[in-house]
Amino acid sequence: MDFIINQSLKLVESGLVPDQAIRAAIRALSKKRLIQEGRYDPEQGAQRYMDVLNMLKHSQIAIETDKANEQHYELPTAFFEAVLGKRLKYSACFFPHDRTGLDEAEEFALQIYSDRAQLNDGQHILELGCGWGSFTLWMAERYPNAKITAVSNSATQRQHILSKAEKYGLMNIDVITCDVNVLELQQNAFDRVVSVEMFEHVRNYQKLFEKIQSWLKADGLLWCHIFCHRFLHYPFEIKSEYDWMSRYFFTGGLMPASSTFLHFQQHLELSQHWQWSGTHYEKTANAWLENMDHNAEQLKPLFEKVYAQDAAAWWQRWRIFFMACAELFGFEQGQEWIIGHFLFKKKAV
């Protein structure tokens, strides 16, 4: 069976299979995932949920952190500048209307983040997993008297953010390159800790939240944005040829449930919780794919430089990755896989 799947994937990666057929296959695999994880079987679902929860509690903070860098950031920043929106926001954006464009959707999302995290000028704000600085730079612009400390595991991203900060005259940004497993920061130093789509690369939230609790001031808050499933949580593992996403784009990652954090409140207490429909990510990923296709002429030489003889296959893999994100989060009109926002306060001693 694995041989048949392998040959089918090679055909799909050749670019000969129409996008419509690829999207249909992705929807079928999404349904298969729901069945495997016990979405429609209460007994199986509860057991699977607890098995994963116990695994998380006995894991290190994050695994395969170097692999995540390789899989997403070996392409030069120029690729993401051509594919993402103006802010280089590599995460779900917010589309209040059908006519909303990607650049505008980025701005809507960032403003929502600020409101929900209760950000104010003059605060010391830590961003964990800052990407190319979409939120870090936005906060630095919006709150000139705030001090922004951003953490990324990518030296390339650090260079990009500092270059942009210098260009725009932003003097209130510090960027740290570090693996979250070994990250150590000053205690009681931050008014806010914010994170956008980084906690999906985390396994042991108890250990991470303990660290964050120590970094926050007494009245400090943690706010985070994650993608998640409404009921299920599961790790991305490479067990068979079916596990294409785990192999090429999300090794060591986790699909949290909207309830996963509820089990990790020893150090931080959940104060508020919001959800977005998965259709916002569907629209985001489709916009990225549209930009990639539109800029194919300028981007394909980048792929040839990075991937050499495998350039054509990797071009299609990135296209499939964006289609997979769009179809997964658009599944059942965005009511299965969704976006979660969480606000935590320090637990009373």
Residue ranges and their predicted role:
Residues 132-144:
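Conserved SAM-binding loop of SAM-dependent methyltransferases across substrates and taxa
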Residues 32-116:
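Conserved Class I S-adenosyl-L-methionine-dependent methyltransferase catalytic core
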Residues 147-152:
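Conserved SAM-binding motif I beta-strand of class I
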Residues 121-131:
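Conserved class I S-adenosyl-L-methionine
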Residues 182-193:
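A short acidic, Gly/Pro-enriched loop at the edge of an enzyme's catalytic core
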Residues 167-182:
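Conserved SAM-binding strand-loop segment of SAM-dependent methyltransferases
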Residues 228, 234-336, 346-348:
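Substrate-binding/catalytic lobe of Class I Rossmann-like enzymes that use SAM or dcSAM, i.e.
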Residues 206-221:
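A short glycine-rich, Lys/Arg-flanked "PGG" loop and its adjoining helix->strand segment in the class I
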